[in-house]
Amino acid sequence: MDGDDLIASVYRKIEREKALITAASNMRQSTDNPLVQQRVDANIRDGRKNIAYLEEKMRELQLRQMKQEGASPTDKRLPPNPDGSAPVPPPKDYAPGYSGHEREYGDASGAYPHGGAGTMPSGAPFADPRPFAPVPKARPNYTKLDLIKYDTPYLGPKIQLMLSQLEFKLSVEKQYKAGIEKMVRLYQDEGDRKSRQDAEGRRIESNQKIQLLKQALKRYEDLHVDIESAEAPDDESLSTPNLRKPLTGLLTLRIHAVEDVDHAASSRFSRGPETFVVVKVEDAIKARTKATRTDKWQDEPFNIEIDKANEIELTVYDKSGDRPTPIGMLWVRISDIAEEMRRKKIESEFNASGWVSADKMEHGAAHGRQDAGGAPGSSNRPPSGGHSGGPGQGYAGGAPGGASAGPVLIDSWFALEPVGRIHLTLSFAKQLKDRRPFDIGLNRQGAVRQKKEEVHEKQGHKFVTQQFYNIMRCALCGDFLKYAAGMQCADCKYTCHRKCYPKVVTKCISKANYETDPDEEKINHRIPHRFEGFSNISANWCCHCGYLLPFGRKSAKRCTECGLTCHAQCTHLVPDFCGMSMEAANQILETLIRAKNHNKSASVSSGLSGRTLRPGGPPQAPQDNVALAYPQKPVEGAYGAPQRQPSAEAISAATNTYIPPQSPTAAQRQHIPPRTSSSQSPAAAAAAAAAAATGLRTPQQASDPNRPVQPPPSSHAHYDPAAYASYQQAIPPQAMQKMGAPYGMPQQQQQQAVAPMQQQVAVKEEIPPQQPKVRIGLDHFNFLAVLGKGNFGKVMLAETKSTKKLYAIKVLKKEFIIENDEVESTKSEKRVFLIANKERHPFLLNLHACFQTETRVYFVMEYISGGDLMLHIQRGQFGLKRAQFYAAEVLLALKYFHENGVIYRDLKLDNILLTLDGHIKIADYGLCKENMWYGSTTSTFCGTPEFMAPEILLDKKYGRAVDWWAFGVLIYQMLLQQSPFRGEDEDEIYDAILADEPLYPIHMPRDSVSILQKLLTREPELRLGSGPTDAQEVMSHAFFRNINWDDIYHKRVPPPFLPTISSPTDTSNFDQEFTSVTPVLTPVQSVLSQAMQEEFRGFSYTADFA
């Protein structure tokens, strides 16, 4: 529909509403019945509200049409480059901050130019290059509960929500009615008269509910305006996985009155109908009000115990005859009640505090200046009357805190469907196992990581059990998974019932080439779908991954032939079965496989029964994969829309067309290159590392005059993480030229690097390697204290028996590592340590050695005795200069990680240690992810709740930008001594991250607000630091205008604070909960098999500088 037709359509809707208002006004004048007048007044009110909404849409359409017809070139979005191409990402080894090759830290061009007084930094050398850079749009400040309230001003979002909800409710009610009709026929056949009458009554009620739902759906469809906007993102709020978990607790509900409902018709001489309300929780009746003829209830409180439920349903009935008639319905999600109460609690705390959101500060509220000469902390002292330095104090203006004045209740009129409203008072008390105090203090939190589920392999799919907290649709049979567990492929996200996954015989496209599959795996029905974009305004599900499609045009595709719908990113995963349902396709394939097996001998049949007949590479981890470029080939793996089922003759004909080919043997088809572990050739790996150390130095490393002098190489081979990774994955030299060598390295130089490795390996085969100087083991150390504990194990302070040097040793149980499938994660942590060791980065914790015993593995790390920043911020508030100093050093550490393809993913105060000379060291590399360059993505759900970026919570692919979000939370905590997103449990924190806007003291310096606003941008592509220049964007911000980066890197800036200890073994800067524990290794009873011990071969390591 073009612009003129759309405007004409909206105009007709407006005229229709005006005609309805005129007719309602005439009716009101012609009657004296107060009930009729009340109903007519409600219709007029709703009509005027609808006209205001439609007129607003009309203005939007007219304005957009004027821009399209008369827009100048400058009005349009400009591409990043003049030729329209995307900006070129920097090479992986591009490090302008450290080398004299491009720009020094102290170079004037690398620092922020003085004079930019606005919120947006002017002239930053690494800012967004576009003249009209995208700016995050203001987020509407409403909740899902606001949308179902009667007087909600957000009519547009409400229409979208109700279109989806009503269509789903209608489809469920139709299924329910079909089931009841079968019961009626069954009871009729059995002659059970009483049961038949009961079922017949339920069938009548279901029919009445269907009519109500159709009436409500039509009302919203008449109001909906389909405005196609390329700029508007799709609304994915209804299809958010892993977010809305079923809740347990106590629901307090009070029903006061109903108004403006269409009462059931009654005879002329009878009294009015009796009205009552039934409350259901997950289809089970939990409460019922008394019957009334006044539409009011005086004392109807209900306390309802909720046990892992998602939704409550309120249905208003009129009883004027033998059977009650439903006249109005309302559905309320329990999680929406809990979210509304959380927001009300926060609002009550902040109302009198003087803290505001960033957008309000930009309208003249914030004029604070970040004065370099000001006293540290001059603008962020705690409010008067508070004790300075306490863990709960904040910025000037009065920090929010303390308990609210009374219990938080939700009292409002809610809209009934299709007409009317109901007055409710609601509250919900969640039952929590580990309730956090709802205050502003900072406390330690452990990181969470997605558990690796048991993998069920079927036809190349790696199915894992997944608990879904929203309505899903099975890709095989097409039925719903309602808040239930299902099976989902970890690679292609194919989703189905638990009972359906054994029936899946179509292949996983992420692991195969359809064209090379054996003929017996295919059927002759290969008709591709014709997918085209469409505006999704109702409840449609993806036929592959099963999620509800988002509202809008960007992500929704529909087949113009068979009506199948899916996500745009799932279209290449849908098989070419247009016109055939997935159940029929799988039935045909099963028949073909049975015929093939019948024609083969018993021995061959038994040999192939459990195999996936496809060549494939080494198995990949089901989680946390770098984004895969799926081959653009059709795949069997999605359900078809309900279509005609092929007849038995058609299935027989398809079976008969199959001719068993003279295929090669199973062993040839199943040939997989053997996987070589890193431990099979330790001498080769060490030799390769030695060659790499001498031959793979980048020009920046060779030409940097400011680099600290490195110690001369030792006689034994130097360990290089790139070579370690290359040999562990057994990459051949041809592939290593593409993957192992640094990005942007000339091909000739890469070949020269490979050749010495091969020569060195040959030499090592002939000449026995020299004995290492010292083989470090457990008997070299005395354990003195426990420094920390976690689900990983312990970190203990130890001293060497010979030199009395102190080290921090991280101890992990092998049994725990194997049970939790963390072997590869442990090896990855070691590789990240080697990356930090490579340049002895000043702000990263270094590794001195690794060793192992029969039951444990040990990381021997440098000991940092100053404690972590969490301890110090709890002892006293950081001033502005101190927070800026720590933030600058953390930024350089993240910059180094990102330049080496590592994202950190667990940035928090607990993981930042303070040395005795006042500088920081980032520790704990357990959640780091390697091979994450610009544009690379992964999807593992992990991190510390308060620091997790929105894209992680939304189960989306994410990249390096998650570190910059966490960096923003870190700066906020250091400046304001509280978290920007908080709640009583993890779910509330996640809700806050996705919905709340961070609040700031009214006099907070503008540059501080600006950097937090840009780092805490929910759209990752718009976040500061998300571009190809990465950390340089953040370094160029006005918040760091007075920072000389070269001086920071070389520790020439005097630190603002120096921790103190009474002796080298003083552990007073660590939590007494841990240091009071006796430092002993608890006995391990289990014995690991030889195969389990093999998993840790090659783990031992000693650094050159140790």
Curated annotation (Swiss-Prot):
Enzyme class, UniProt record, top EC level: transferase
Domain AGC-kinase C-terminal positions: 1041-1106
Active site, UniProt feature: D906 (proton acceptor)
Catalysed reaction equations from the record: L-seryl-[protein] + ATP = O-phospho-L-seryl-[protein] + ADP + H(+); L-threonyl-[protein] + ATP = O-phospho-L-threonyl-[protein] + ADP + H(+)
Modified positions (Phosphothreonine) in chain numbering: T1082
Effect of G579R: Blocks the activation of the cell wall integrity pathway, abolishes the interaction with hsp90, and impairs the production of fumiquinazoline C
Residue numbers of Phosphoserine PTMs: S1100
Pro residues composition-biased segments: 79-93
Cellular component aspect of the GO annotation: cytoplasm; cytoplasmic stress granule; cytoskeleton; nucleus; site of polarized growth
Gene3D superfamilies documented for this protein: 3.30.60.20, C2 domain, HR1 repeat, Phosphorylase Kinase, domain 1, Transferase(Phosphotransferase) domain 1
Keywords: ATP-binding, Kinase, Metal-binding, Nucleotide-binding, Phosphoprotein, Repeat, Serine/threonine-protein kinase, Transferase, Virulence, Zinc, Zinc-finger
Protein's GO biological process: cellular response to starvation; fungal-type cell wall biogenesis; fungal-type cell wall organization; intracellular signal transduction; pexophagy; positive regulation of cytoplasmic mRNA processing body assembly; regulation of fungal-type cell wall organization; regulation of nuclear-transcribed mRNA poly(A) tail shortening
Biased composition (Gly residues): 386-400
Pfam family, one: Pkinase
Annotated GO MF terms: ATP binding; diacylglycerol-dependent serine/threonine kinase activity; protein serine kinase activity; protein serine/threonine kinase activity; zinc ion binding
Extent of Low complexity compositional bias: 683-693
Subunit structure comment from the entry: Interacts with hsp90.
Family note: Belongs to the protein kinase superfamily. AGC Ser/Thr protein kinase family. PKC subfamily.
Role noted for this protein: Protein kinase C; part of cell wall integrity (CWI) signaling pathway composed of pkcA, the bck1-mkk2-mpka MAPK cascade and the downstream rlmA transcription regulator. The CWI signaling pathway regulates cell wall integrity and pyomelanin formation. CWI also controls oxidative stress response, gliotoxin production, iron adaptation and asexual development. Finally, CWI is constitutively required for A.fumigatus to cope with the temperature increase found in the mammalian lung environment, during infection. Modulates the expression of fumiquinazoline cluster during conidiogenesis.
Name of the protein: Protein kinase C
Species annotation: Aspergillus fumigatus (strain ATCC MYA-4609 / CBS 101355 / FGSC A1100 / Af293)
